[in-house]
Amino acid sequence: MKVAVLGAAGGIGQALALLLKTQLPSGSELSLYDIAPVTPGVAVDLSHIPTAVKIKGFSGEDATPALEGANVVLISAGVARKPGMDRSDLFNVNAGIVKNLVQQVAKTCPKACIGIITNPVNTTVAIAAEVLKKAGVYDKNKLFGVTTLDIIRSNTFVAELKGKQPGEVEVPVIGGHSGVTILPLLSQVPGVSFTEQEVADLTKRIQNAGTEVVEAKAGGGSATLSMGQAAARFGLSLVRALQGEQGVVECAYVEGDGQYARFFSQPLLLGKNGVEERKSIGTLSAFEKNALEGMLDTLKKDIALGEEFVNK
């Protein structure tokens, strides 16, 4: 199994590469790519960690050598948020980066599963889909927007509030991956109940958690370490499913039946070909139904922005 990380010299990329080097199954290959010249050195640094995961690093304009034979490609390349920016301010720079990298994936490893981490995910996934479609290699079961950070944050905040072990809590999060489009389904957490005020406060905290980190880092960056962990969790789940493990479920932002929007984050059963089954979002509370209705315009606009970027 070969995993390629594009944007591997950045804050998320390095954290992700470290976790994959220590946690990928024995015999896996890990390939790191970034435009930055430091990237082969990041691979050398990680190669000293004693795990049976082969690692190589590549830098420069051409990602092809890193992509050859890749089964999973995780894309974290792009600029990070600064205070006062929201994820959509990133669009102007990151849209071009994602388009370029996905074009290279389409040429070199068109059958790979692709996880898009680069923000704004609501839009960059639509860009990736249109690029793959133009290249004639789009498979909607193999393109994912990685929203796992919303899930791990939800799990952490709920566990803190309710005095649970974080490992015992799994909150499904649906919708998109920024602001109001992030909808944690708190009504579906088994064995935990919330007051209306708790639901409102938690939902808001989960939606604004990225900003919490950006502000706390005082201009020094955005959420890189928790995002690295989230991306590793998603990437490792995908690898296990591709290798035939049964019953692997993760939420991610994918193209579905279009009931709510063309792309929508929901629980997915993963399998040997990527998405095996898009699972139902279940029964929503009145608060959740309302929040879902209220986000769809924003989500659809975000998606249209990505489609137009490629097709203009």
From Swiss-Prot:
Belongs to the LDH/MDH superfamily. MDH type 1 family. The active site is at H177 (proton acceptor). The gene is mdh. Substrate binds at R81, R87, N119, R153. Its EC number is 1.1.1.37. This is Malate dehydrogenase. NAD(+) binds at G7, A8, A9, G10, G11, I12, G13, D34, N94, I117, T118, N119, M227. GO terms for cellular component: cytoplasm. It comes from Escherichia coli O17:K52:H18 (strain UMN026 / ExPEC). GO terms for biological process: malate metabolic process; tricarboxylic acid cycle.
